[in-house]
Regions:
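A short beta-loop-alpha structural element at the N-terminal edge
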Residues: 5-19
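Conserved beta-strand-loop-alpha-helix junction that forms the acyl-donor binding cleft
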Residues: 107, 133-145, 161-173
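Glycine-rich phosphate/pyrophosphate-binding loop shared by adenosine-nucleotide-utilizing enzymes
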Residues: 6, 57-61, 95
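Conserved acyl-donor/pantetheine-binding loop and adjacent beta-alpha core of acyl/acetyltransferases
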Residues: 63-99, 160-171
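Conserved active-site alpha-helix within GNAT-family acetyltransferase domains
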Residues: 113, 125, 139-158
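Conserved GNAT acetyl-CoA-binding A-motif
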Residues: 95, 123-138
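Conserved acetyl-CoA-binding loop-helix of GNAT-fold acetyltransferases
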Residues: 102, 108-123, 150
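Active-site rim helix/loop that mediates acceptor-substrate recognition in acyltransferases
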Residues: 29-54, 58-69, 82-86
Length: 182
């Protein structure tokens, strides 16, 4: 695979089936978000919903929302399938990365890093005077957590039993909310 042939672009509605394929191949069923949630994300904040293409195939995505920075985070803000229509604020100052995945066969090539860096490096085009970037990562995803820590993110709170793996094994992982101040 030639990483130089990766194209990053804004998502389109006709990408939805491929986005869902990536979602379902990347996460346990109880963690996957609904089709309508992704459609709403595309329609509400298309500039913050990027896809990676390789040979004209969508192989990864990252989507985000703009929130108003709040020191006192509410667990309800992070619910799976929450409505971007209610959470997204065009006048906000915090970028929340709501979902991020790459097809399994294309992992380990740096595609996730390309998507993540493209979104975060262009934050000033998305938000006027950005204050921070926020995301949630499963406690058991230690390699992802270390990547975020190396990029300057800090753990700010724990969402108990946030990730439900019941369709794979009887296990729930805590979600770690991480924030990077800009």
């Amino acid at each position: 695979m030639n990483i130089n042939n990766i194209k990053i672009r804004n998502s389109k509605i006709n990408d939805i089936e491929k986005i869902l394929e990536i979602e379902h191949s990347s996460f346990a069923r109880n963690i996957c978000e609904d089709k309508q949630v992704f459609i709403d994300r595309i329609n509400t904040f298309n500039k913050g919903f990027l896809v990676a293409e390789y040979d004209n195939e969508v192989i990864g995505y990252i989507c985000s929302e703009i929130w108003i920075y709040d020191e006192n985070l509410k667990e309800s803000s992070f619910l799976l399938n929450h409505s971007i229509k209610e959470a997204h604020k065009n006048n906000g100052n915090e970028l929340y990365i709501s979902s991020f995945a790459v097809l399994p066969k294309f992992r380990k090539f740096g595609i996730g890093k390309i998507l993540f860096n493209y979104l975060t490096d262009n934050i000033n085009k998305l938000i006027k005077n950005p204050k921070s970037i926020l995301l949630v990562v499963a406690e058991n995803w230690s390699s992802a957590r270390s990547i975020y820590i190396n990029k300057g993110f800090q753990e700010v709170c724990i969402l108990n039993s946030f990730f439900d793996y019941a369709d794979i094994e009887p296990f729930k992982a805590n979600g770690i909310v991480m924030r990077k101040l800009l």
